Swiss-Prot record:
It catalyses: L-arabinose(out) + ATP + H2O = L-arabinose(in) + ADP + phosphate + H(+). The keyword Isomerase does not apply. It is found in: Cell inner membrane. It comes from Burkholderia thailandensis (strain ATCC 700388 / DSM 13276 / CCUG 48851 / CIP 106301 / E264). GO terms for molecular function: ABC-type L-arabinose transporter activity; ATP binding; ATP hydrolysis activity. Residues 35-270, 281-524 form the ABC transporter domain. Residues 7-25 have a biased composition (Low complexity). This is Arabinose import ATP-binding protein AraG 2. The keyword Repeat applies. The gene is araG2. PANTHER family: ARABINOSE IMPORT ATP-BINDING PROTEIN ARAG (PTHR43790:SF6), CARBOHYDRATE TRANSPORT ATP-BINDING PROTEIN MG119-RELATED (PTHR43790). GO terms for cellular component: plasma membrane.
Length: 525
């Protein structure tokens, strides 16, 4: 098994006795810094991306990096990988000053970056990707037998049962990520940085990644872990450093004693209460009601209602049926029993288009795959639904109307984009989510179904999204929020429906909502 293999090698390399802490040397003293940054400054025209940043990472630790988008985390990784050259400051690796002119130079020195967008060649095989840059050859001819043998050995070390001759394009995201990790290990990288590695992984793939990272840590490697997710910091990190506006704000030396409110305050530059900014309101009549609804993912009939001006959270563990329920409400799946009522009238949707016409819209969990057309412009994405109102006979006028509509909502929702023609794929996750919301605002939607609306979005952008939800509720709209983030679902919801194994386990009023109460309802008996 991979983690056992890596741990065994790590114990031999580090010589650590039983009972030594992860950051301790064999004699119990703290391990020395493996990587040191001193006064690193990176500037671009008109922008100081990193401002005199100093940071140390120890061998045998997982060091978390947190901060909003634009805080400087990605620039720091690019300095480590040789993509960006600092204008000032020193980078030391094992006490020796280094300056990398290329990613190859950084990798040869022992630094590997596992980016969010994986850098593999889809058309090449697993073996070829693992060995890129060091393909075995005999007299200048590729030694395929040696290639496959070395790749097979590495896959076994990772615990991956993959045919090394498989083209990478046929692998899952989780499998591709393991190939990236394998590449780093084959080059004996002692510093490995992960950039938001779980953003596209399933729960099972995430669990497997965490086991690998724990094993790498036990092997004495220095791990840098960039994330937005507090639960990942709790599960993995020994220390965590917060960045804001290109500066290192603070390093928290013990995650076990971490003050979450203080950490989030460091990230956004204001108290945590301002992040959720909850404001109560008096709800109106029932807007949407499910009565005995059955369908894919639901083990028992589901019944609930939500009122105008109300924000209802849906919490549960993976497989609880929350996303499946949203798809039934949206017409993306057909119920096998029960029905939905909208404003007191029974409705039935043959497709999502029918739901939108009736006033129900969904912002999907997989924003990039189901919510946007990444290569299309912000304006095109914003107008995807509204175009059905425009007249084919008046194309020029309607093109003008589309641009006016896009400009209006870009301003109204403070969407950060160069202009309306910018490809939406170039925007941050928070701004992509705003474009999806703008699309439905242009449709005069009454019921908004939000499935994991802030996944992969930094804390500052989350606050803006939450404020949009409050504005919708203040205007009498109904917002249903599926969220796996306990603090979020408690912080923004008027009440919370807890689902478990395809059924509703209970409904909790805001005054009684606590992490313990929700978890107890969500856990299988």
């Amino acid at each position: 098994m991979t983690d056992t293999t890596i741990r065994a090698r790590g114990a031999q390399a580090a010589g650590s006795p039983a009972g030594a802490g992860p950051l301790d040397a064999p004699d119990g003293a703290p391990r020395a810094a493996c990587l040191e940054l001193d006064g690193i400054t990176v500037t671009f025209p008109g922008v100081r991306a990193l401002d005199a940043v100093s940071l140390s990472v120890r061998a045998g630790e997982v060091h978390g990096l947190m901060g909003e988008n634009g805080a400087g985390k990605s620039t720091l990784l690019k300095v480590l990988s040789g993509v960006n050259q600092p204008q000032a400051g020193t980078l030391r690796l094992n006490g020796l000053a280094q300056r990398f002119g290329s990613t190859r130079a950084a990798l040869e020195a022992g630094i590997a970056i596992i980016y969010q967008e994986l850098h593999l060649v889809p058309e090449l095989t697993v073996a070829e990707n693992l060995m890129l840059g060091q393909l075995p050859n005999r007299a200048g001819v590729l030694d395929e037998r040696a290639l496959v043998a070395r790749a097979t050995a590495e896959l076994e070390r990772l615990g991956e049962r993959i045919d090394p001759n498989t083209p990478v394009k046929l692998l899952s995201i989780g499998q591709r990520q393991m190939i990236e990790i394998g590449k780093a290990l084959m080059r004996d990288a002692r510093v490995i940085a992960f950039d938001e590695p779980t953003s596209s992984l399933s729960a099972r793939e995430t669990e497997r990644l965490f086991r690998i990272i724990h094993a790498l840590r036990a092997d004495g490697r220095a791990i840098i872990y960039v994330t937005h997710r507090m639960e990942e910091v709790d599960a993995l990190c020994d220390r965590v450093t917060v960045f804001r506006d290109g500066r290192r704000i603070e390093t928290f030396e013990s995650v076990a004693d971490l003050d979450r409110d203080r950490l989030i305050g460091c990230m956004v530059g204001r108290p945590i209460a301002d992040v959720y900014g909850y404001r109560p309101r008096e709800p109106g009549d029932v807007a949407i009601e499910a009565k005995g609804l059955r369908g894919p993912g639901l083990a028992e009939p589901v019944s609930f209602s939500a009122r105008r001006g109300e924000i209802v959270g849906f919490f549960g563990l993976v497989g609880a049926g929350r996303s499946e329920l949203m798809k039934l409400l949206y017409g993306a799946a057909r119920p096998s029993a029960g029905h939905v009522e909208l404003n007191g009238r029974r409705v039935s949707f043959a497709s999502p288009r029918d739901a939108v016409r009736a006033g129900i819209a969904l912002c999907p969990e997989d924003r990039k795959q189901e919510g946007i057309v990444a290569i299309a412009s912000v304006a095109d994405n914003l107008n995807l639904s509204a175009r059905r109102h425009f007249s084919p006979a008046r194309l020029l006028l309607d093109a003008r109307r589309e641009r006016e509509l896009a400009a209006r909502y870009i301003a109204r929702l403070a969407i950060k984009t160069r202009d309306a023609d910018t490809p939406i794929g170039a925007l941050s996750g928070g701004n992509q989510q705003k474009v999806i919301l703008a699309r439905w605002l242009a449709e005069r939607i009454d019921v908004f179904l939000m499935d994991e609306p802030t996944r992969g979005i930094d804390v500052g952008a989350r606050a803006e999204i939450y404020n949009l939800f409050y504005e919708l509720a203040d205007a009498g709209r109904t917002v249903l929020i599926v969220s796996s983030d306990l603090a979020e679902v408690i912080g923004v919801s008027d009440r919370i429906v807890v689902m478990k194994q395809g059924r509703i386990a209970g409904c909790v009023a805001k005054a009684q909502a606590s992490p313990d109460a929700l978890i107890k309802l969500a856990l299988p008996r």
